[in-house]
């Protein structure tokens, strides 16, 4: 099998290694698509630690079953699957049978990668997004635009989309957002409708208070948290979905005085993520969620570095890259 691994800062190399055999409860999968995730940007940028070996990346996998180990008989050769595991930037990977789900019929593997939408669905499942809710999404990259689609399945009254990139705001409007704001305009939006009452132009649904019942932060950086705070209504909910990997992530104490609930949108529990993946893939099967406008770039196994470079540069037109070995 072939595998792409990071051998130095921003540099990957394709190696040929023996194809592993699945053990008990495992499945050997031929990888057909693997998403490039921002959570792996740091190891790609920094490369291996001194004395460390190559770094194998990729954890957003969809592929075809080619062999099963003992206790994995529910899967058949040739079935298309997605799930949790890695490394994904390779031609093959051994995955745990219990962490796989079937790719919905008629959906190509690159449009059915379960791991990223499962993490989004699980985060939303712990927030009170219901029919008629006002919801704001801060950050309109892959995660934010995915959240937008999943929020729409809950029939919200209003979706407020926030990002400094005008291209991202346009995408959000095309995917069903009602209002698209630059972060610099958030404070005025939050105050104007309240000042003007139910007739205020700022509130897309005519409500006296245009702030959101639920705010979903999907930037992973502290300025995103600062932008989110003014949009949370009193006794509303802020869900931190973005990955804040290191250091401190201070919150606006005004949330405290508003009686807001803060939800950690990260989930380390495999059973919860797999349940969320089941629900998310149902939305994919029902065409209520689609990767089509989100997967903007595709590369072969030799394009891993190019994919990460586009992501790191926030290149125009880029939302999500998929490696197709």
Residue ranges of model-derived segments:
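Glycine-rich cofactor phosphate-binding loops and adjacent beta1-alpha1 units
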Residues: 175-261
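Mid-domain Rossmann-like dinucleotide-binding core that forms the NAD(H)/NADP(H) cofactor-binding site
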Residues: 110-185, 201
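Conserved beta-strand positions in the Rossmann-like core of class I SAM-dependent methyltransferases
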Residues: 66, 160, 239
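C-terminal substrate-binding/catalytic core of Rossmann-like NAD(P)-dependent dehydrogenases/reductases
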Residues: 248-296, 306
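A structural motif shared across PLP-dependent enzymes of the aminotransferase-like
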Residues: 85-97
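Glycine-rich beta-strand-centered segment in the early N-terminal region that forms part
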Residues: 18-35, 47-87
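C-terminal capping/lid region of NAD(P)-dependent oxidoreductase domains
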Residues: 2, 209, 239, 243, ...
